């Protein structure tokens, strides 16, 4: 699945720092607005289950699930067209907003208000979608006769128009299945799954609060957008440490896990993706599929021959393996099971496909 997440927001909010944390790409950051270059790189999705399997099998190769991440240049005056064009190319949106204070990194709006900044970026996306809706409605009404599929599309567009004019993204629009199909090709921006990441400073991290938090949470909640906080400055320090030092640092800071892990996992989830796992001495690997994928289709992710010659999927629940610590013990207790081609693969299933070609 070649799916992409776009980091969007105003300039100087920490998008490129977050991009580097997700991808280890080492893209250049700066203390001034005006970047026009789009950064693109792959981000591995942290998965403790895969780490456990690696400890069990000591494989020659370790392959986590991955997503492509695009660092879109910040939305600034005069950059609207380029910004919107870049947003059209991604499958999901991560709105990065700034709550951190800094004397060296100026805010483009001169004062901090992450709720306002989020709303302003959203407004650009809503306005762009509204223009698409209005243009298409004008073309439909200019036609001689409106019937059949066009009638369905017109009704869908009118619902979309009402949603957008109310300041809501189209992912919240109340459209029937056939109505979504009728407008799918229009490439709406506010249909894309979204996530908000608030970049806070170290003091705010310790205080567990930031300015305008209630307003931002209220705005996001009304639009069913999850909100995560991350202190990119601290996360950069964490990323620079060796594994043993990292554990001590996290414990001293009273952080359960690096915030960047939560962001990566949330990106994956917002795209409706899950992972099934394969494990052995050669490789432990997380395979990316959409939630609801049947076993035979999942087998095709590993190899087309396995899908073609699919017989059964030998499935082990990760929690059972983690609890018992040994695949042999899982089988002894009758907890390994054989599933057919229609079995819906669950997140974290450890699968060995039986096939014949």
Each predicted region: which residue ranges?
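Long, charged N-terminal accessory/stalk domains
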Residues: 68, 80-185, 196, 228
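Conserved nucleotide-binding/hydrolysis micro-motifs of P-loop NTPases
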Residues: 25, 48-50, 73-76, 98-104, ...
């Amino acid at each position: 699945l070649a799916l992409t997440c776009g980091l969007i927001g105003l300039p100087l909010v920490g998008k490129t720092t977050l991009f580097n944390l997700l991808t280890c790409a080492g893209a250049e950051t700066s203390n001034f607005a005006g970047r026009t270059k789009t950064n693109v790189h792959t981000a591995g999705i942290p998965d403790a289950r895969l780490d456990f399997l690696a400890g069990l099998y000591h494989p020659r190769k370790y392959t986590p699930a991955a997503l492509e991440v695009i660092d879109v240049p910040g939305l600034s005056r005069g950059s609207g067209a380029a910004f919107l064009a870049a947003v059209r190319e991604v499958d999901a949106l991560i709105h990065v907003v700034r709550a951190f204070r800094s004397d060296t990194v100026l805010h483009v709006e001169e004062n901090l208000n992450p709720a306002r900044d989020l709303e302003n970026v959203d407004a650009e996306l809503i306005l762009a979608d509204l223009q698409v809706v209005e243009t298409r409605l004008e073309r439909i009404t200019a036609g001689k006769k409106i019937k059949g599929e066009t009638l369905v599309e017109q009704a869908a567009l009118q619902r979309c128009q009402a949603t957008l004019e109310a300041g809501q993204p189209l992912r919240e629009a109340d459209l029937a299945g056939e109505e979504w199909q009728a407008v799918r090709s229009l490439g709406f921006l506010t249909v894309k799954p979204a996530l908000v990441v608030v970049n806070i400073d170290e003091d705010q991290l310790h205080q567990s609060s930031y300015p305008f938090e209630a307003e931002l949470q209220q705005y996001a909640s009304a639009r069913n957008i999850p909100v995560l906080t991350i202190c990119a400055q601290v996360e950069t320090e964490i990323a620079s440490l060796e594994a043993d030092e990292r554990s001590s640092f996290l414990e001293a800071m009273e952080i359960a896990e690096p915030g960047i892990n939560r962001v990566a996992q949330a990106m994956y989830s917002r795209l409706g993706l899950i992972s099934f796992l394969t494990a052995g001495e050669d490789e432990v690997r997380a395979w990316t599929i959409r939630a609801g994928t049947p076993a035979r289709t999942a087998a095709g992710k590993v190899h087309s021959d396995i899908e073609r010659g699919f017989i059964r999927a030998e499935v082990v629940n990760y929690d059972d393996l983690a609890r018992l610590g040994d695949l042999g013990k899982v089988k002894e207790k009758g907890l390994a099971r054989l599933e057919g081609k229609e079995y819906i693969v669950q997140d974290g299933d450890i699968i060995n496909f039986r096939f014949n070609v």
